[in-house]
């Protein structure tokens, strides 16, 4: 607001007028409607909150009689209207402003200064008011120094500063309350009541606020102590507890009485009084709170201060001022009680973890075990428990163990299905996984790879005297190739057939069953590995050896049936062979020879070791019928394709026995 050339009044002078001459003092609040309802000076009025009235006032449309009537009609504290009154105008805090601007609205900050200037000019000319004064510092400074002389309108109160009370800024009607013979609790209004302080012989005051003024009856600074804290959830009041306790103890030894107060006497000052009771009367935080609550029911410290009282209780226990049994919550002190006393472990409810926890393998008397010791268990009631245990032991049959025996024998749970308190639950015995079967891991060396699989191969052929030795196979596992004997002097294609051990030579007319997995011959001088679709083997035409899968029997074939023993090929490729010269030598008497494997054009770069094509056998009529799709080559004729295939590079694997 702008500085006016008129009489000003201080905050102390206005407080004196309100107390001493409220009937002849008219206080006008020139602020807005919202600010007035939040807080204003006691018995003040807000007559010009309407925009219409303000506009008419600025335009000089209100005469003096209407203006005075407007003020008198809104006044509630001034009762002596016939006498001359003292008029006090106030607004917000006085702030210097620059160039004046045009007032945009009546609620702008400049409107309050303009209202005060217009009212002063209009009311000075009347003889109704003895003086027109302006409050120095505005309402903010007055509210800081004299909060007890400020009030709020109903329905527009401030938000509470504590969750435990609707509004802590409003003083209660408890007055000054006696807590101990030398300690009183009160509010800011009580600290300014000199008559009451003199009647109670109170000469020492502790003020827990930052704005409340010092009591006028306290002349010496040694009898006054200020603790600058606010009633909020961030303030720390506990650091002042020891200093306040020493100050109160000094007053008690001197025989003086002390008043502890804050703004309303609800949160801050009761917290300090509770801390003193805790140390002086050796009570826990809960007991001290009830002690003060019984004498002053309006107290309600906020949650921040209540938590600091619990922390102060722990400090007193560590300093051996309070005993563990006197604490409000004894289980919070970990130094005195073991972990098993505070929170016993629970038995898992999951079916997969019923047997996860192992039994206790440590001694129960071990200092590292968190189980309940005999000394701590002795502090609990033992009469009923011992009587119950003795009766249960006596009533139990001899075959059944007692409760204590069952609890001792079981390392996991007791008879009630709960986890045994005596088991050791150290970190090494905690379950690391569920009770599932473990899978054996495979090392890196055991993982299959081309290098490891190739190292397992052996290039040594099977021996003739050990037919049960596993046969080496270099072909694709989808095409199991047999190993058959060959002879260099024969060009006839003969297929050895496995037959059962009990079969005879007379059963050659039946259709044979082929098994390409185990073909072997004792008279073979060379081992040939071939693909069954591209295998053409040279064997003596005079005889052949048919081996059973077990290798126990062989059936020789006659030399005269060499032409009939030729196998007709069935499948996808033709068979090209040369007529073998007549020979009477047996495979046993033939000289060792080699067999050549022709590599077809489509498999020359695949790296598969093959021999001449050997296909499945077809029936005689299928080979001779025109519907078979091919004609049998004449004996003695040589196909050009066969020559070209046989002339290709081959691979020989000799085997020396």
Curated annotation (Swiss-Prot):
Residues 406-419 have a biased composition (Polar residues). GO terms for biological process: determination of adult lifespan; negative regulation of axon extension involved in regeneration; negative regulation of defense response to bacterium; negative regulation of JNK cascade; negative regulation of MAPK cascade; negative regulation of p38MAPK cascade; negative regulation of protein localization to nucleus; negative regulation of protein phosphorylation. Its EC number is 3.1.3.48. Coiled coil: none annotated. The active site is at residue 262. SUPFAM superfamilies: (Phosphotyrosine protein) phosphatases II, Rhodanese/Cell cycle control phosphatase. Residues 353-426, 539-563, 581-657 are annotated as: Disordered. Gene3D superfamilies: Protein tyrosine phosphatase superfamily, Rhodanese-like domain. Keywords: Hydrolase, Protein phosphatase. Residues 366-405, 542-563, 581-597 have a biased composition (Low complexity). Residues 175-318 form the Tyrosine-protein phosphatase domain. One of its GO terms (cellular component) is cytoplasm. May interact with pmk-3. PANTHER family: DUAL SPECIFICITY PROTEIN PHOSPHATASE (PTHR10159), TYROSINE-PROTEIN PHOSPHATASE VHP-1 (PTHR10159:SF533). Acts preferentially on the c-Jun N-terminal kinase (JNK) and p38 MAPKs. Plays an important role in the heavy metal stress response and in axon regeneration by negatively regulating the kgb-1 (JNK-like) and the pmk-1 (p38-type) MAPK signaling pathways. This is Tyrosine-protein phosphatase vhp-1. It comes from Caenorhabditis elegans.
């Amino acid at each position: 607001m702008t500085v006016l050339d008129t009489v000003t009044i201080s905050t102390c002078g206005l407080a004196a007028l309100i107390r001493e001459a409220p009937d002849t003092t008219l206080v006008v609040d020139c602020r807005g409607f919202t600010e007035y309802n939040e807080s204003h000076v006691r018995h003040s009025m807000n007559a010009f909150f309407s925009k219409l009235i303000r506009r008419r006032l600025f335009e000089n449309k209100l005469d003096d009689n209407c203006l005075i009537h407007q003020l008198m009609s809104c006044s509630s504290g001034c009762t002596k209207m016939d006498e001359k009154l003292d008029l006090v105008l106030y607004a917000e805090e006085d702030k210097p402003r620059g160039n004046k601007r045009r007032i945009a609205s009546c609620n702008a900050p400049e409107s309050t200064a303009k209202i005060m200037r217009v009212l002063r000019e209009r009311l000075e000319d009347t003889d109704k008011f003895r003086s027109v004064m302006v409050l120095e510092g505005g309402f903010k400074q007055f509210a800081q120094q004299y909060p007890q002389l400020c009030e709020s309108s109903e329905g527009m109160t401030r938000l509470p500063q504590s969750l435990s009370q609707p509004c802590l800024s409003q003083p209660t009607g408890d007055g000054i309350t006696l807590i101990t013979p030398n300690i009183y609790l009160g509010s800011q209004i009580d600290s300014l009541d000199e008559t009451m302080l003199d009647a109670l012989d109170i000469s020492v005051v502790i003020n827990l606020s930052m704005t409340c003024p010092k009591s006028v009856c306290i002349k010496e600074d040694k009898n006054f102590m200020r603790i600058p804290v606010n009633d909020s959830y961030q303030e720390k009041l506990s650091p002042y507890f020891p200093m306040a306790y020493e100050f109160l103890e000094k007053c008690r030894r001197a025989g003086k009485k002390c008043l502890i107060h804050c703004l309303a006497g609800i949160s801050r000052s009761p917290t300090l009084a509770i801390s003193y009771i805790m140390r002086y009367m050796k009570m826990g935080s809960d007991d001290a709170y009830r002690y003060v609550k019984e004498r002053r029911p309006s107290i309600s410290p906020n949650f921040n201060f209540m938590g600091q009282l619990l922390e102060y209780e722990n400090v007193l226990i560590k300093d051996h001022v309070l005993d563990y049994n006197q604490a409000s919550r004894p289980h919070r002190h970990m130094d005195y009680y073991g972990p098993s006393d505070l929170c016993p472990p629970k038995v898992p409810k999951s079916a997969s973890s019923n047997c996860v926890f192992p039994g206790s393998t440590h001694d129960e008397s071990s200092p590292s075990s968190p189980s309940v010791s005999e000394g701590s268990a002795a502090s609990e009631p033992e009469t009923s428990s011992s009587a119950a245990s003795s009766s249960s032991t006596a009533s139990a049959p001899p075959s059944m163990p007692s409760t204590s025996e069952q609890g001792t024998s079981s390392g996991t749970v007791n008879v009630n299905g709960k986890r045994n308190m005596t088991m050791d639950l150290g970190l090494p015995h905690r379950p690391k996984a569920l009770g599932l079967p473990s899978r054996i891991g495979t090392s890196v060396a055991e993982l299959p790879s081309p290098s490891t699989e190739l190292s397992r191969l052996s290039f040594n052929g099977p021996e003739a005297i050990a037919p049960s030795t596993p046969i080496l196979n270099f072909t694709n596992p989808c095409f199991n190739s047999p190993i058959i004997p060959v002879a260099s002097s024969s060009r006839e294609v003969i297929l050895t057939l496995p037959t059962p051990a009990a079969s005879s030579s007379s059963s050659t007319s039946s259709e044979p069953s082929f098994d390409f997995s185990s073909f072997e011959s004792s008279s073979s001088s060379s081992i040939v590995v071939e693909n069954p679709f591209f295998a053409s083997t040279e064997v003596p035409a005079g005889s052949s050896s048919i081996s059973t899968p077990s290798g126990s029997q062989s059936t020789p074939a006659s030399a005269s049936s060499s032409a009939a023993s030729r196998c007709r090929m069935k499948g996808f490729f033709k068979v090209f062979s040369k007529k073998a010269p007549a020979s009477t030598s047996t495979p046993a008497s033939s000289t060792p020879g080699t067999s050549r494997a022709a590599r077809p054009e489509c498999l020359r770069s695949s790296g598969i070791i093959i021999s001449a094509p050997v296909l499945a056998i077809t029936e005689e009529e299928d080979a001779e019928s025109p519907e078979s799709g091919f004609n049998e080559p004449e004996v003695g004729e040589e196909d050009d394709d066969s020559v070209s295939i046989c002339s290709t590079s081959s691979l020989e694997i000799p085997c020396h026995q």
